[in-house]
Regions:
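Short active-site oxyanion
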Residues: 1-5, 81
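Mixed-charge interfacial surface used for oligomerization/domain docking
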Residues: 4, 10-24, 28-31, 35, ...
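Class I S-adenosyl-L-methionine
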Residues: 36-108
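Short beta->alpha junction loops
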Residues: 63, 114-115
Length: 282
């Protein structure tokens, strides 16, 4: 079968991976001061950080609408035997619901809820592409993805809590205390939603090293074909610390460690100073 894999712009895959696997992205919208912008088309994460740092209100995001999905599915379903679309987790956004409504008009379009975001979602996108290259049918690929999504480990540590505070996800007292005490929470995707699972204290570099060590040292069933370091702007050297710590505590080769940048959705909710390590289990 000639299968096309598509995904929401929230998957945080690099331009190189998108080109390698010929992935089509459906962009979410970013709302800034009441005006709508298309994610990574006419607004970038840097635009959002600059806006907030200059005293602007926190930006928000909105799901891809049904009509936008329908246009993409109409074009691609006519050119391919099947289209598999992976959305950001359904508990984070209405994208899955909207994509499912749009896909109802096209019998060869399949929609999968990643139950994840960022490169947690991206892992499954790449997985779908690899399975298609192996010759599996669309139905077989979707079944495999639904089975594998619980094996994705996705988490981040955050240097700044002001974005969470402005978004109502932590109090101003907690945000101030985190800044004064240099506390970096670890936020993980658990059962399709985000939860604080740990916290670290100290410089960002030291917290990154401890965080990566903690999530890898006890894992005995990590897949070694792909791991992501996904981040917003972080202090110089932090990504390299994450990379070296990954190699120290797991047997990843350099070519299987992928560095990617966060999209506007993560930028809106987490801000700069966010770094995550995301992998799959066997």
């Amino acid at each position: 079968m000639n299968i096309k894999v598509t995904s929401d712009s929230t998957c945080d895959l690099s331009p190189e991976l998108i080109e390698k696997y010929n992935i089509t992205l459906t962009p979410l919208s970013v709302i800034k001061d009441g005006e709508s912008f298309i994610d990574c088309v006419d607004i970038t994460p840097e635009d959002i950080y600059r806006h907030v740092d200059n005293g602007g209100a926190l930006c928000s995001t909105s799901a891809v609408n049904v009509d936008s999905y329908r246009k993409v599915f109409k074009e691609l379903s006519a050119r391919y035997d099947a289209v598999i679309h992976l959305t950001i987790g359904s508990l984070f956004s209405a994208c899955y619901q909207n994509a499912s409504i749009a896909a109802a008009n096209f019998p060869n379009v399949y929609v999968v809820d990643s139950m994840n975001l960022s490169t947690g979602q991206g892992h499954l996108v790449i997985e779908a592409c690899e399975l298609a290259r192996q010759g599996l049918t669309a139905v077989e690929i979707c079944a495999r993805l639904n089975e594998q999504r619980s094996r994705v480990y996705a988490s981040f540590i955050m240097d700044r809590l002001d974005y969470m505070q402005k978004g109502g996800r932590c109090s101003s007292v907690v945000a101030l205390g985190g800044k004064l005490l240099r506390i970096k929470p670890e936020i993980a995707v658990v059962d399709g939603t985000m939860k604080m699972v740990d916290k670290y204290r100290g410089s960002f570099d030291k917290c990154v090293e401890k965080y990566v060590k903690d999530i890898l040292k006890e894992q005995k069933d990590i897949r070694l074909d792909r791991i992501f370091i996904t981040h917003s702007p972080v202090p110089d050297g932090a990504v390299e610390i994450a990379r070296e710590t990954i190699k120290k505590y797991a047997d990843f080769k350099d070519e299987n460690i992928y560095e990617t940048s966060t999209n506007c959705t993560v930028a809106c909710h987490c801000g700069p100073g966010t770094l995550g390590v995301l992998f799959m289990k066997k």
